[in-house]
Amino acid sequence: MEEKEDLLRVGSFTEKFNNVLGISMEPLEIFRSKGLPAHMVKRKHYKCLKYIDYIPDIIANPDYIGINPNESGDSIELVKRYEDNVLLGIKLDTDGQYLYVSTMYDVQESKVSRRLHSGRLKQFEVDKKEEK
């Protein structure tokens, strides 16, 4: 990952993510590289370029969260429904000092449904109230 001056702060990891996912990641700041748009173009994720300024909202208010089983180390996925379903991949920097947005792309509704059914994604409610 680049030096810190090439990064933009986009949010914070919340303890609520740990609670829903049953993990224990350290609650660190989340950054994105200034080069993320170029990465998205290179990976042909054009559809999500219009959502790049929504990253703080996706982090603060995801509809679904999960763990990518294909990634080693600390890596989570956040999905937010807009006109398109937008997935953010967030990883722990190798130095372990911060989290960063590793990828961003759209996912089809059928894929979201399959991942919910398999347990890879879990519904996330920010203001969930406990019922008595």
Language-model regions, residue ranges each:
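Ribonuclease/tRNase effector modules and their secretory precursors
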Residues: 1-132
